[in-house]
């Protein structure tokens, strides 16, 4: 029977992967290439297409795993460039994680001995949610973070039920994967650790493992948390040391000119605490419907007052609270996708809730299904008609990037072209000879920006000043160049937001 269930899990995961990847390819060929996702592909592209070839070209700001997994596609793109320029590689990675999340959820129902009918229905309601489908196909990291979160919560609830240390090891490995995808893994780990400590303090089974006297309970909690979180702590320390050894700044990923903190100058104010709360709720409420149904199911089955409810609140809403604080402090843009995690994390607690309900498990499953269905309907409507929920559809690669690449390919071949890849990443990916260009990861980039004439630069590509264009290295070094020019540079083309200059010799 167990073998048959595993086959079903793999079959469902394979189907999800193939559907998501096919949908991602469709999106790419129809121009839906989201900027953040394509930037991850670009980071991998630089490794094999910018001299000298090395992994540091991937950059130190964004977590490396999504880019690292695309390196085989980047290598193959030397013969067929659409593998990277049409989103085939990035959709492969997001589809892979979407399948992982679905498999983890489906297997969790089996671990909790839930009815197969309920397991399949609830897993499909999660997998077919429009938000899950879109982010499983578009190469963004939200589905990757969500899948790792489902794996973590699955093992958390299985550990709470059985106490087996095997699940702690699995949680630790999943946290490593999560950290290599997004930095939100750190606050999420804190919320999970608090939930684990609460469980060990209250659970009668856990109390059997330590004497209830002196500091023994604290030592037991500490040792359990070390077992769980040491892998991700080690990974985070390695990442800090990696930044330090290369840049001299251990927190380069947090405070450099390309980091998220550099964006904060462009984030709007939301009018204090109440304004921030209103802003967040207007975006997060459809994501909360599965969790609201989960709480209702626990109330209907008389399990709401158990301590596990507090653990669920910490795990599902912790990142939402963290993001709200960041928005209030002006450190987050508050996009809908930054608030989507309850949609991924709440379903992971459904198997435990159905199991804990005992004879009322059918009722808990039905209520949970209604919450998942309601969320799917609202988000499906939002993608069609709501400007709020359609905002993520509009954040594509910079317009005219391909036209700039076409111009450079046709008119500037053989010349030394200088550009900051911050806004020109998609132009670089469409270049015929990107190895000849000087971009942000090139060893001589800073010298060329400081003195293009002395360093033999032939052409410059400069984005329009204003908003994110102000973060471009050339605009920072030469603030008059875009609008007024410089005596050593002649404008030869203007394409969309970009201007191309020839350096006078």
Residue ranges and their predicted role:
Residues 59-62, 131-144:
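Short acidic/glycine- and proline-prone juxtamembrane loop motifs at membrane-interface regions
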Residues 89-113, 151-155:
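Transmembrane-helix motifs of polytopic, lipid-linked glycan transferases
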Residues 191, 198, 202-206, 219-294:
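Membrane-lumen/periplasm interface segments of specific transmembrane helices
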Residues 136, 142, 187, 331-362:
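Hydrophobic/aromatic-rich transmembrane helices and adjacent perimembrane loops
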Residues 282-309, 350:
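Hydrophobic, aromatic-rich transmembrane alpha-helices
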Residues 14, 117, 229, 233, ...:
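Signature aromatic-anchored transmembrane alpha helix within multi-pass, membrane-resident enzymes
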Residues 367-425, 442, 446:
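Membrane-embedded, lumen/periplasm-facing catalytic core of multi-pass transferases
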